Amino acid sequence: MKGFLKPNFSLGALFLTLSPIATACIAEKPVNNRFNFNSEQLARLRKARVNHWRDGDTLEVSFANNHQKPIRIYAIDTPEKAVLSIQRKSEIELKEANKATEFAKSLIPIGSEVWIWPLNSYSYDREVAAVFFKTNPLQLHFESFAVEMVANGHALPIAGNDFDFVFSDLDPFNPLKIVGIELANGLNNAFNNRKNIFSYLENSFQSITMVYQQRGVDQSWTRYLAPSNDFSSTKLGLGLTIYELKLNNG
């Protein structure tokens, strides 16, 4: 996914000058991480079993034919475990990366069943896909791994360059069209309550610039914030938020 905002990018310096009060008291909606798919959507899912968690947004699974594959989870980004640049090495980022990995392992332990929704694209050796799971094997609804990670402050929701098409020209079976609003609800909950990656520095936005040091921040995460939030993409002139796109496109 594209659209990364490097730690020393000029917009980042501008955002840091904004008042901490700007992040307070933004309305949020409860997160509903329950999804019921129709027959066409169910046909997109591939059942798999979790073999290993590389980090909070990458896992390795095996399918019924015993074929094994690494999966890069679509639409989220967790802090980086690998040290890509000594100059940008951050103990805080490593701490949050490890917390994200451990949360993923506790949410979906090794050996658990998951349902993979492939996007027919790759990131290095990893197939990009949405991941769904069931807390109870008897339940009919599915839960989104991405929504759970974001709502608990372990990941940022991202959309790259496709965001403007989420509620218009994007493939109607793209999982982001289904889970996008709940990703936004989860983000606003974590942001307002300063959970994990949002718990550093003077406010939640500044905290992100502190945590995501290795690769910078994909600025599309601001498009999931409530329009009234002073750090939302609408207020910063980076495009409409997902709430506004849904309102405009149904």
Swiss-Prot record:
- Which SMART domains did the record assign? SNc (SM00318)
Q: Which GO terms describe its molecular function?
A: endonuclease activity; nucleic acid binding
Report the membrane topology from the UniProt record: Lipid-anchor
Q: Which residues form the TNase-like domain?
A: 44-200
What InterPro entries would the database entry show? SNase_OB-fold_sf, Staphylococal_nuclease_OB-fold, Thermonucl_AS
Q: Where is the lipid attached (S-diacylglycerol cysteine)?
A: 25
PROSITE patterns noted in UniProt: PROKAR_LIPOPROTEIN, TNASE_1, TNASE_3
Positions where lipid (N-palmitoyl cysteine) attaches = 25
Question: Where does it mainly reside?
Answer: membrane
Keyword tags: Cell membrane, Endonuclease, Hydrolase, Lipoprotein, Membrane, Nuclease, Palmitate, Signal
Identify the stretch annotated as signal peptide in this record.
1-24
GO CC terms = plasma membrane
Annotated protein name in UniProt: Uncharacterized lipoprotein MG186
Name its species.
Answer: Mycoplasma genitalium (strain ATCC 33530 / DSM 19775 / NCTC 10195 / G37)
